[in-house]
Structure formats: structure tokens, C-alpha cells
From Swiss-Prot:
It comes from the Eukaryota. It is found in: Nucleus. One of its GO terms (molecular function) is DNA-binding transcription factor activity. Residues 33-91 form the TCP domain. It comes from Arabidopsis thaliana (Mouse-ear cress). Plays a pivotal role in the control of morphogenesis of shoot organs by negatively regulating the expression of boundary-specific genes such as CUC genes, probably through the induction of miRNA (e.g. miR164). Participates in ovule development. PANTHER family: TRANSCRIPTION FACTOR TCP17, TRANSCRIPTION FACTOR TCP4-RELATED. Pfam families: TCP. Expressed in cotyledons, particularly in the vascular region, in leaves, roots, stems, buds, flowers and siliques. This is Transcription factor TCP17. GO terms for cellular component: nucleus.
Length: 242
């Protein structure tokens, strides 16, 4: 029982160290990042934690994963680094380039070189690998949230506003940034119309030259009598479509 508590305490300590690791930087789309995946700080600056492999290298990694019976391809890299630990230890430590600490003040406490992962014991590295899987799962959750927010913002920014009867002196509101592309993509199935009800509500129809400038001649069937007529005014469709 005491051993289990010690393991939990050690795992919590490693998790805290990982979240507070100054070499891990999270980039969010909300703050201008192209993607939201975490990046790692290296002697060459921030680098994406995801590494692109050549075709042949990817095949070898997947084959080795099957032969080792590992659950994830990334564990193959961990295994290779573990096997090569003695050779890696013979390499000179990574040195910070001149001016590195000025550009990365949060890393000033690391000394003259980056701390190595191999300085941890095997049990600690295994616990760290467990936390890494949790981190990856958390990344997937944030991916889903970012995708949902991006989709919602896209819908809001691409809304089309058409003539709306708000009072006896109604005005026309247009947001035609993507209208022509929408018409092209949906092959004329867009449910938009300038209703003929303006005759009954003292509304002035848009001028023919205005409509011609908004809709090119590639949609000749859409133009008639100076107004857009995708369906007749007797249709049950509403006048305001969003």
C-alpha cells in the first residue's frame, strides 16, 4: 500500500514537471498559431513536436513496432533512444548559441546545456511515457474544441443577409462576400430571393444595373426584370434567409 502511494506521488511529480517544463510551448489558433499542437524549445528555436518521416523510414518504424509488440509508433523511437543510450552519452552536450537566453528568458535556469531525458531512471521514463500518452489524448480533445470553434466562427462570418422587412421603410442588407461562390457550389439550389412584396410595403427594388454588377452574366437565368428570381413571390419560402 505504501509503495502504491509512493508511485502515485512520483507520477504526480513527473506530471507537474512536464506541465511546468519550460521547453514545452503550446501554440493555440486563438493566438495566431497555424496549428494548436505543442512545440518544443531547441537550440534552433521552437520546433514542432511532430516529425515527418520519409516513406522508407516510416515503413521501418511500423515494421519495428510490430516486431517489438508496441502499441504506438512513438514508442519505437523511445526504444531506439534507450538502446542507443550509451552511444548518445558519448556525444558532447548541446550548447546554447550566443544570445539564446536573451530570446528565451524562461530557460535561463537550465545552465549551459539542455537537461537530457536520459538523466532519468528507467522507471521514471516509463512513468513519463504514460503521461505523454495522456498529453496526446488531451491534444485530441483540444483539437476537437478548436475545430468546433473554427467551424462556428466560419458560419458566423459567411452568413448571407437578404432583404428583410423590418418596418414600413425597410432597407436592403447585403453580405455578398461568398454569394457567387455559394451559387456555383450548390448549383442554383441556394434558397435566396428578392421578394416581390416590396410593392406592398413601399420598398424600392434594387436597380437593374446594381443587380447586373452583383451577379455576372454566367447566371443569366437568375436575372429578370432587374431582380433576382430563384423562385416566385408566391412561394412559401421566407423573405429573410440566413
Amino acid at each position: 500500500m505504501g509503495i502504491k502511494k509512493e508511485d502515485q506521488k512520483s507520477s504526480l511529480s513527473l506530471l507537474t514537471q512536464r506541465w511546468n517544463n519550460p521547453r514545452i510551448v503550446r501554440v493555440s489558433r486563438a493566438f495566431g498559431g497555424k496549428d494548436r499542437h505543442s512545440k518544443v524549445c531547441t537550440v534552433r528555436g521552437l520546433r514542432d513536436r511532430r516529425i515527418r518521416l520519409s516513406v522508407m523510414t516510416a515503413i521501418q518504424v511500423y515494421d519495428l513496432q510490430e516486431r517489438l509488440g508496441l502499441s504506438q509508433p512513438s514508442k519505437v523511437i523511445d526504444w531506439l533512444l534507450e538502446v542507443a543510450k550509451n552511444d548518445v552519452d558519448l556525444l558532447p552536450p548541446l550548447q546554447f548559441p550566443p544570445g539564446f537566453h536573451q530570446l528565451n528568458p524562461n530557460l535561463t535556469g537550465l545552465g549551459e546545456s539542455f537537461p537530457g531525458v536520459f538523466d532519468l531512471g528507467r522507471t521514471q521514463r516509463e512513468a513519463l511515457d504514460l503521461e505523454k500518452r495522456k498529453w496526446v489524448n488531451l491534444d485530441h480533445v483540444f483539437d476537437h474544441i478548436d475545430h468546433h470553434n473554427h467551424f462556428s466562427n466560419s458560419i458566423q462570418s459567411n452568413k448571407l443577409y437578404f432583404p428583410t422587412i423590418t418596418s414600413s421603410s425597410s432597407s436592403y442588407h447585403y453580405n455578398l462576400g461568398h454569394l457567387q461562390q455559394s451559387l456555383l457550389d450548390q448549383s442554383g439550389n441556394v434558397t435566396v430571393a428578392f421578394s416581390n412584396n416590396y410593392n406592398n410595403n413601399n420598398l424600392n427594388p434594387p436597380a437593374a444595373e446594381t443587380m447586373s454588377s452583383l451577379f455576372p452574366t454566367r447566371y443569366p437565368s437568375f436575372l429578370g426584370g432587374g431582380q433576382l428570381q430563384l423562385f416566385s413571390s408566391t412561394s412559401s419560402q421566407p423573405d429573410h434567409i440566413e
